[in-house]
Amino acid sequence: MSSSPVNVKKLKVSELKEELKKRRLSDKGLKAELMERLQAALDDEEAGGRPAMEPGNGSLDLGGDSAGRSGAGLEQEAAAGGDEEEEEEEEEEEGISALDGDQMELGEENGAAGAADSGPMEEEEAASEDENGDDQGFQEGEDELGDEEEGAGDENGHGEQQPQPPATQQQQPQQQRGAAKEAAGKSSGPTSLFAVTVAPPGARQGQQQAGGKKKAEGGGGGGRPGAPAAGDGKTEQKGGDKKRGVKRPREDHGRGYFEYIEENKYSRAKSPQPPVEEEDEHFDDTVVCLDTYNCDLHFKISRDRLSASSLTMESFAFLWAGGRASYGVSKGKVCFEMKVTEKIPVRHLYTKDIDIHEVRIGWSLTTSGMLLGEEEFSYGYSLKGIKTCNCETEDYGEKFDENDVITCFANFESDEVELSYAKNGQDLGVAFKISKEVLAGRPLFPHVLCHNCAVEFNFGQKEKPYFPIPEEYTFIQNVPLEDRVRGPKGPEEKKDCEVVMMIGLPGAGKTTWVTKHAAENPGKYNILGTNTIMDKMMVAGFKKQMADTGKLNTLLQRAPQCLGKFIEIAARKKRNFILDQTNVSAAAQRRKMCLFAGFQRKAVVVCPKDEDYKQRTQKKAEVEGKDLPEHAVLKMKGNFTLPEVAECFDEITYVELQKEEAQKLLEQYKEESKKALPPEKKQNTGSKKSNKNKSGKNQFNRGGGHRGRGGFNMRGGNFRGGAPGNRGGYNRRGNMPQRGGGGGGSGGIGYPYPRAPVFPGRGSYSNRGNYNRGGMPNRGNYNQNFRGRGNNRGYKNQSQGYNQWQQGQFWGQKPWSQHYHQGYY
């Protein structure tokens, strides 16, 4: 770690953001990412001959006693500090981020002895940031980097950092700043999201041991800043290894781990309201345009259906989005034009050595997937000057950029079908030749694939093309209707749409069933699962870049988060869907299915025999590696609930064990889970807080009553200048207007002091989230009283905000606020 006086590991999230703002760096992201970014900035300041910010210059002074405080102590101090309102808010947020003890258990399992105290706290805090952050869950980056650096930090057993002589703080050699930073070739500036190469655990440990030997042999010149003399080097190095331990890196967490974490959010969320119906648009079906049915859910198409872009908010910036035109052709000489109108900025991603903007344009069959160039009979020309088909790439033509126009030609009249391109009117030659026998008369459809870019099409609707085309070619819109082939159409009514929810433990065989069922019904279903999200992230070239920078784990972490938003979008589309997730808890089943009101809602339960399940999980672990901790599987077994037809399903199918046999097996699983796992922590209802002179939030009125805030015998009997009644008592502060509100009765139990009227109350008859705070206009609606202050921090707001799809911030990506109507998504 750095020798800077700012101990990054001891800072809270608010302090990390403050330090980053002072250095004009972004303060968005998870706690571990903020730590990494700040540490990199401090290292660069030292390497550049500029001392890190001193405490006297505005930096936080964490030396002395404050450096020795544990993370739990800091949280307690934060909860106790500030005024009374901030105290209650922090207590509420601690209750929200509890995660039923799951994050704590995961941290204890994955941490080493030296990091056992800090790991669970940080993972819980990171989960709280992700759910209740200021940016509504808009948090990008990888927290695994912060965990690894923390596990490798120079700490003793109590989390204290050894004091270092100021004179040695400027002597850290550049080669000791970390092999990861050298591999990225970075000499100055903040660390980017993808710029650090993560070494395997064995290599990391070997580097630490080799570094220890060099320090011991090389004396003070090459040693760690603040280290003892050369004679004590070996002793301290050995002691440091024992105290520090080896923390399990986050790369060991596979896809199942992040699915498990995301699934847990449903157990603490409120049931969402059904989404707003999609507007029925009357559109001329004979016009060639972008097809709103044959496109990705996150492919945002304009009202006129002639321009589009990929969604770039939150983790969607990692995804590629594609779409096809509504008509294809199989004869003649046909063309269309595509213009790159914008490379959409994605400032919430800190990227380097990664291409985050890309466009592929070309042709494909209607049976091909949306990832242009990744399958057979899918032909694309890339913005990078590369042609792609069936994942095979080859240099072609030249690169193109914003405001360039690409004309795509298809010649079906030659001996072989020829696909060629032109850039800004300049012919680039033939890119692909397809055998007519192999193509077998099947039509080719215009197809585009975008990655954080916006495009515009001319299928022939413009009076004048962007650039002149050869006389023998015709725009596809001008081809006679009988010579065009219409792409597949979706259901016309929502009652004709079908949603199938898979239910089963990880590795039970759900994806196998989905693959088989989709193959039996080609083109019918859109599969919503982590695998499909990963496919849209890991397009061949992008996957290689991510692998080179060691950030594939970032995609695994973001995929389940994107999937939740995909489900919300899907509920507004008239399509058929399969939800390929575990969905074992009744809460997850109910909250997802209530979004699809009006659909034919079906459940498919995959529950094999216990012996078969063990064999399948063992086989999966051998092939893919174990990606889910054992205790997480046990908890899912304990939460496994079979669906009921009367609740939210119209039809339930049991693939292997039938309902009676499956129910017996689940009872066995629940007993196994109960014996193996510790008792779950009860959710904080506020009743225990009363013994500590704390307010009973969400139980009684804020202005008084038995446990009211500031009421009799609360907060040490502090009556704050008034009679021994509640906070809104009669003669409080010299007959000033009463602050408390509520119904009838006395201000405090047993005291005959009248209360204030209901409507001017600061928090009326019920809790803080009820009715009003300072008058009838609501700060929080009447029913939003579950997690305090009326903000409804449940599933359908803030980080999981359903309403954000209907509000302005979703459409704040200029210039799309002028081109797209808000009701579309």
UniProtKB/Swiss-Prot annotation:
The modification ADP-ribosylserine is found at residue 187. PANTHER family: HETEROGENEOUS NUCLEAR RIBONUCLEOPROTEIN U (PTHR12381:SF11), HETEROGENEOUS NUCLEAR RIBONUCLEOPROTEIN U FAMILY MEMBER (PTHR12381). Pfam families: AAA_33, SAP, SPRY. The modification Phosphotyrosine is found at residue 266. GO terms for cellular component: catalytic step 2 spliceosome; cell surface; centrosome; CRD-mediated mRNA stability complex; cytoplasmic ribonucleoprotein granule; cytosol; dendrite; inactive sex chromosome. Residues 710-728, 739-749 have a biased composition (Gly residues). The modification N6-acetyllysine is found at residues 17, 21, 186, 265, 352, 516, 524, 551, 565, 635, 814. It is linked to Developmental and epileptic encephalopathy 54: A form of epileptic encephalopathy, a heterogeneous group of severe early-onset epilepsies characterized by refractory seizures, neurodevelopmental impairment, and poor prognosis. Development is normal prior to seizure onset, after which cognitive and motor delays become apparent. Changing residue 59 to A: No change in interaction with AURKA, PLK1 and TPX2. Increases mitotic chromosome misalignment and chromosome segregation defects and time required to progress through mitosis. This is Heterogeneous nuclear ribonucleoprotein U. Residues 41-281, 671-749, 769-799 are annotated as: Disordered. The modification Phosphothreonine is found at residues 286, 532, 582. The modification Citrulline is found at residue 255. The modification N-acetylserine is found at residue 2. It comes from Homo sapiens (Human). Residues 8-42 form the SAP domain. There is a cross-link at residue 265 (Glycyl lysine isopeptide (Lys-Gly) (interchain with G-Cter in SUMO1)). Residues 714-739 are annotated as: RNA-binding RGG-box. PROSITE patterns: B302_SPRY, SAP. The modification Asymmetric dimethylarginine is found at residues 715, 720, 727, 733, 739, 755, 762.
